[in-house]
Curated annotation (Swiss-Prot):
Organism: Bacillus methanolicus
Pfam families: ADH_Fe_C (PF25137), Fe-ADH (PF00465)
Intrachain disulfide bonds: none
SUPFAM superfamilies documented for this protein: Dehydroquinate synthase-like
Effect noted on mutating G95A: Shows a 10-fold decreased affinity for NAD and NADH and a strongly reduced dehydrogenase activity. Completely insensitive to the stimulating effect of the activator protein Act
Name the UniProt record assigns to this protein: NAD-dependent methanol dehydrogenase
PROSITE patterns attached to this UniProt entry: ADH_IRON_1 (PS00913), ADH_IRON_2 (PS00060)
Catalytic reaction(s) noted: methanol + NAD(+) = formaldehyde + NADH + H(+)
Pathway the protein takes part in: One-carbon metabolism; methanol degradation; formaldehyde from methanol: step 1/1
Localization, UniProt: Cytoplasm
Amino acid sequence: MTNFFIPPASVIGRGAVKEVGTRLKQIGAKKALIVTDAFLHSTGLSEEVAKNIREAGLDVAIFPKAQPDPADTQVHEGVDVFKQENCDALVSIGGGSSHDTAKAIGLVAANGGRINDYQGVNSVEKPVVPVVAITTTAGTGSETTSLAVITDSARKVKMPVIDEKITPTVAIVDPELMVKKPAGLTIATGMDALSHAIEAYVAKGATPVTDAFAIQAMKLINEYLPKAVANGEDIEAREAMAYAQYMAGVAFNNGGLGLVHSISHQVGGVYKLQHGICNSVNMPHVCAFNLIAKTERFAHIAELLGENVSGLSTAAAAERAIVALERYNKNFGIPSGYAEMGVKEEDIELLAKNAFEDVCTQSNPRVATVQDIAQIIKNAL
């Protein structure tokens, strides 16, 4: 039996952000708390969204304190503001950091306690505060998922919180919000989306439904990510990547992830590194480890990513997937290893132990020991 989770409503395309006030009104909201980061707030985007909400006859407050790799401290501060402002809905603006922060605020505001109490799978008892997630980057897919990743500031460990109840009520994906994003951010978020599609396609929980989303996401990313990097104002490329990251998010939300994310959660949490780049660095090494478990699928991935596999055996074609990922990293100027990013060999044991315990490890296609994971991280240095 397959369970499939997706936001009850999704609005995708140019100008979609103008739907926010109408959508909030439809779900019965009276006052929304906008959750965003300081930079997006400084651009005036949150005020534009707030204006749209007010024009729909609703009240609004703004919490512009979402941060990369959001921590429990920001979540709890947001919960306090949500309650002080007497809000009954949340609007997140940004990428995964804003969306995950809003999901976590909505969870704790409705269920009590601390976000740290909800680490793991299906630990949420009551319905959460509705979230309208407005995406400004093509990468995390967080607007589609039942996952929030929050850093435990005391333990310096990323805590995945997974529960269908935290899936946003409405996902808004507007490519016009993605134009003019710098190439570096486009690369990091685009490679994050690619990692979602690849891991979902080979995950233990993959189904024909998730396969369809993952395959189409890989096709679009292979064609349009280089174009979006080369010209951030290419609206066709931005729109294609908007759809790709949405589909990749749906795929991994229902099919699962794997060691790419288990490892990057730890590396990013300890060293405060960009999530998409952490994924990119370890992805060739994780895929090399997983090849024997999903050889035919990796052969297909190689083809989807532009490798010529004609005349090759399935095993040889599968290895071309690793070549493709290394090509992506080289072409996009991604560091060749974690050492360049400041990761220290003496931390590998702790990183591997925490990655082994990460919930994403459960859906990796090949069973891995702590020692296996340590070797993968060492290879990625």
